[in-house]
């Protein structure tokens, strides 16, 4: 048992036998819990272990203070249980308009390796942006928006009560069942396939499209920035897959071949690190049919590149990936994500530059034609 879980159990907040989490006890004893958790600083923060939400909140605050010239913490919304949702914006000052890369982790509560990767990604960018020419190049024209834990209520619940909880924690059917699958709640052919209207089910799609406060917060923000977002990345586990749209239909997005090409290159970069094999394809083709996913919704609103990463492993440990695998998982995934970002960057700015060259050539041709008439 983890030290924090031992503490919660001994304090009576983790009730044995699956009876649940006593919120009143948690509130009254929070101060005791805080004192019982070993003190840490950003310098000693380990990226090789899983962290409870309280430590992730503190990490976000401290990292935005230490690297304040590059990263800022921003309020996004609140969860059903009124926990604040924050994202980190990594940005270098620039006189030019910049495009956006979005990354979220932890939409499914039990997939702990996903928030671990979001933290790893932020750490790697911040520690290396001055010395790594590739990262410097990306930051000249791109801002990174990172939401380390989307499903905060569910994530906390996996630490206190049920390690394999998937959904959010909103009550339904007069409190007889809890939670919505937030990755079935987006407005992308909502609840048409691979989702359930029964609130007892793992894939309960909610009471309507974007019915949950967590999905509303994300959808509202993404909608407001959609014209500037080049790439939408949502990190999951497990299965070792890079998934493209769509899950709700066998039809493909207009740039499907290009997305597969970028995804396959990323899978190759990932494999080169430790030999881990990833498959690339649309969700409907290589995983299963599903509707209401954030990936499909992002593509439907016009974001050109949208991917789901299903991280390690392929089923041996499943959602309970050992901490010994955090570092290699994050290192190889970092290679894949940087490959995607390099390709997206090159495709956008190459086409933009090509467009400017074509326009300039046409203008020059018109000027020459006009001068010949004089």
From Swiss-Prot:
Arranged from A to Z, the UniProt key words for this protein are: Carboxypeptidase, Cell membrane, Glycoprotein, GPI-anchor, Hydrolase, Lipoprotein, Membrane, Metal-binding, Metalloprotease, Protease, Signal, Zinc
**Broad class of enzyme this protein falls into:** hydrolase
Location in the cell: Apical cell membrane
PROSITE patterns xref list: CARBOXYPEPT_ZN_1, PEPTIDASE_M14
Function (record text): Carboxypeptidase which preferentially cleaves C-terminal acidic residues from peptides and proteins. Can also cleave C-terminal hydrophobic amino acids, with a preference for small residues over large residues.
**PANTHER family for the chain:** CARBOXYPEPTIDASE O, PROTEASE FAMILY M14 CARBOXYPEPTIDASE A,B
- Its name, as the record gives it, is Carboxypeptidase O
Natural source organism: Homo sapiens (Human)
- Give the gene that encodes this protein: CPO
């Amino acid at each position: 048992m983890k030290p924090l879980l031992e503490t919660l159990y001994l304090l009576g907040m983790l009730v044995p036998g699956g009876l649940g989490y006593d919120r009143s006890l948690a509130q009254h004893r929070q101060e005791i819990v805080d004192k019982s958790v070993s003190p840490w600083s950003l310098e000693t923060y380990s990226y090789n272990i899983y962290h409870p939400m309280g430590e992730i909140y503190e990490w976000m605050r401290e990292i935005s203070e230490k690297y304040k010239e590059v990263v800022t913490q921003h309020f996004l919304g609140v969860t059903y249980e009124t926990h604040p949702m924050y994202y980190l914006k990594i940005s270098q000052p620039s006189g030019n308009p910049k495009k956006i890369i979005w990354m979220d982790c932890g939409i499914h509560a039990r997939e702990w390796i996903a928030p671990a990767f979001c933290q790893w990604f932020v750490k790697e960018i911040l520690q290396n942006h001055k010395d790594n020419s590739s990262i410097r190049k990306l930051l000249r024209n791109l801002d990174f928006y990172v939401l380390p834990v989307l499903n905060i209520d569910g994530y906390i619940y996996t630490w206190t009560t049920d390690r394999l909880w998937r959904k959010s924690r909103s009550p339904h059917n007069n409190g007889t069942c809890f939670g919505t699958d937030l990755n079935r709640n987006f407005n992308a052919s909502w609840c048409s396939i691979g989702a359930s209207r029964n609130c007892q089910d793992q894939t309960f799609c909610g009471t309507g499209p974007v019915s949950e406060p967590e999905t509303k917060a994300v959808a509202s923000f993404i909608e407001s920035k959609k014209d500037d977002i080049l790439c939408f990345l949502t990190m999951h586990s497990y299965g070792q897959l890079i998934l493209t749209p769509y899950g709700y239909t066998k039809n493909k997005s207009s740039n499907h071949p290009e997305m597969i090409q970028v995804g396959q290159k990323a899978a190759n970069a990932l494999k080169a690190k430790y030999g881990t094999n990833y498959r690339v394809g649309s969700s409907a083709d290589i995983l299963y049919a599903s509707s209401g996913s954030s990936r499909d919704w992002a593509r439907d609103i016009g974001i050109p590149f949208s991917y789901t990463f299903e991280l390690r492993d392929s089923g041996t440990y499943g959602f309970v990936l050992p901490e010994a695998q955090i570092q290699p998982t994050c290192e190889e995934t970092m290679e894949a994500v940087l490959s995607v970002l390099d390709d997206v960057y090159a495709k956008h700015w190459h086409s933009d530059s090509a467009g400017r060259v074509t326009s300039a050539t046409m203008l020059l041709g018109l000027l020459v034609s006009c001068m010949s008439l004089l």
